């Protein structure tokens, strides 16, 4: 079974839509270089593992305070 990670739900937890792919790509690169995975997935796709780790809170975006200025203030 292919578990689907909902990007909109992930944006509710982490409101930085451009930082999420960068964080996932960096984590996938670390996994490719033999880093330890924090979650089990149905496949060995590094991007799927990194997305699941981010959505479950096992990894986080560093320096999140700096990114807060990027959130639009729309009324």
From Swiss-Prot:
Q: Mind telling me which HAMAP family this protein's record contains?
A: RNApol_bact_RpoZ
Instruction: Extract the Pfam families matched here.
Output: RNA_pol_Rpb6
Q: Which InterPro entries match?
A: DNA-dir_RNA_pol_omega, Pol_omega/Rpo6/RPB6, RPB6/omega-like_sf
Q: Which family does the UniProt entry place this protein in?
A: Belongs to the RNA polymerase subunit omega family.
EC assignment: the record states: 2.7.7.6
Signal sequence, start to end? none
Any one GO cellular component localisation term in the record: DNA-directed RNA polymerase complex
Show the GO MF annotations: DNA binding; DNA-directed RNA polymerase activity
Q: Does the keyword Transcription apply?
A: yes
The identity of this protein, by name, is DNA-directed RNA polymerase subunit omega
GO-annotated biological processes: DNA-templated transcription
Top-level class of the enzyme under EC nomenclature? transferase
Encoding gene, per UniProt annotation: rpoZ
- Keywords associated with the record: DNA-directed RNA polymerase, Nucleotidyltransferase, Transcription, Transferase
Q: Which residues form a coiled coil?
A: none
- Swiss-Prot/TrEMBL catalytic activity: RNA(n) + a ribonucleoside 5'-triphosphate = RNA(n+1) + diphosphate
Quaternary structure and interacting proteins, as annotated: The RNAP catalytic core consists of 2 alpha, 1 beta, 1 beta' and 1 omega subunit. When a sigma factor is associated with the core the holoenzyme is formed, which can initiate transcription.
Role of this protein: Promotes RNA polymerase assembly. Latches the N- and C-terminal regions of the beta' subunit thereby facilitating its interaction with the beta and alpha subunits.
